[in-house]
Swiss-Prot record:
Signal peptide per UniProt: 1-21
Intrachain disulfide bonds: C73-C119
Keywords: Antibiotic resistance, Disulfide bond, Hydrolase, Signal
Protein name: Beta-lactamase
Other comments on record: The class A beta-lactamase family has a specific amino-acid numbering system, sometimes called Ambler or ABL numbering and often misspelt as Amber. A multiple sequence alignment was used to derive a consensus sequence and then the consensus was numbered taking into account insertions and deletions. This allows use of identical numbers, e.g. for active site residues, despite differences in protein length. UniProt always uses natural numbering of residues, hence there appear to be differences in numbering between this entry and some papers.
Binding annotation for substrate: K230, T231, G232
UniProt-annotated catalytic positions: S66 (acyl-ester intermediate)
Pfam family, one: Beta-lactamase2
Catalytic function, reaction form: a beta-lactam + H2O = a substituted beta-amino acid
Length: 279
């Protein structure tokens, strides 16, 4: 697919650096920031070559909220590829291991869940207890952060477990990423040698099967477009989505959008993310 030549715009020091393919994405984001009374971060990246197609506040920190679960399952799959884990290994847990919003894991206190089932629950339904159970297998938040450093992400960090990681305090670097780092790391997981082809396809399929992202970019995509995504939401207006998109049913680009520090309702945040992500 042909893309217009990228433009690099130097703004005043008080404004974020913007790289963009045309005026529409920038104008939509500026309008959203004004209406939300908060901050928006966005990166659109070519999946094949890693070129940045559009960006706004690309290097500013935003709470990952539940978008971290894609990275977590990437770390789990890396352990599977290394022979250190098996997707069919069953984990048993107790009532006291459950945290708020565990729609799948709360139903399996008797029989437990496999690693693969936990990843599916964590990504497709954002099950928080599934996320914590998986975090324990990779060494907790510090273990996931170490994995990210190993694959070249020196920015993204996870410091806490669900649900404390959704606190999203202003100025707090804990449990944050930047849009640029998240996009680059997701691309590494899906295209580089950090995961086997089989694991890459599995991670992508879990994102394709996402069942809680309907009101966001999925709501505004043209017919026939591919989408695989993972959303997140937290306190103080935190909201986010990481997605792969493309026409003709093929993933061609990565889109990362984060919001923070806004008093807007969930419905309003969803609407703005959909508007920014609209093709």
């Amino acid at each position: 697919m042909r893309y217009v030549r990228l433009c690099v715009i130097s703004l005043l020091a008080t404004l974020p650096l913007v790289v963009y393919a045309g005026p529409q994405p920038l104008e939509q984001i500026k309008q959203s920031e004004s209406q939300l009374s908060g901050r928006v971060g966005m990166v659109e990246m070519d999946l094949a070559n890693g070129r940045t197609l559009a960006a706004w506040r690309a290097d500013e920190r935003f709470p990952m909220v539940s978008t971290f679960k894609v990275l977590l399952c990437g770390a789990v799959l890396a352990r599977v590829d290394a022979g250190l884990e098996q997707l069919d290994r069953r984990i048993h847990y107790r009532q006291q291991d459950l945290v708020d919003y565990s729609p799948v894991s709360e139903k399996h206190l008797v029989d437990g869940m496999t690693i693969g089932e936990l990843c599916a629950a964590a990504i497709t339904l954002s099950d928080n207890s599934a996320g914590n159970l998986l975090l324990a297998t990779v060494g907790g938040p510090a273990g996931l952060t170490a994995f990210l450093r190993q694959i070249g992400d020196n920015v993204t960090r996870l410091d806490r477990w669900e649900t404390a990681l959704n606190e999203a305090l202003p100025g707090d670097a804990r449990d944050t990423t930047t849009p640029a780092s998240m996009a680059a790391t997701l691309r590494k997981l899906l295209t580089a040698q950090h995961l086997s082809a089989r694991s890459q396809q599995q991670l992508l399929q879990w994102m394709v099967d996402d069942r809680v992202a309907g009101p966001l970019i999925r709501a505004v995509l043209p017919p026939g477009w591919f989408i695989a995504d993972k959303t997140g939401a937290g306190e103080r207006g935190a909201r986010g989505i990481v997605a792969l998109l493309g026409p003709d049913g093929k993933p061609e680009r990565i889109v990362v959008i984060y919001l923070r520090d806004t008093p807007a309702s969930m419905a309003e945040r969803n609407q703005h993310i959909a508007g920014i992500g609209q093709r």
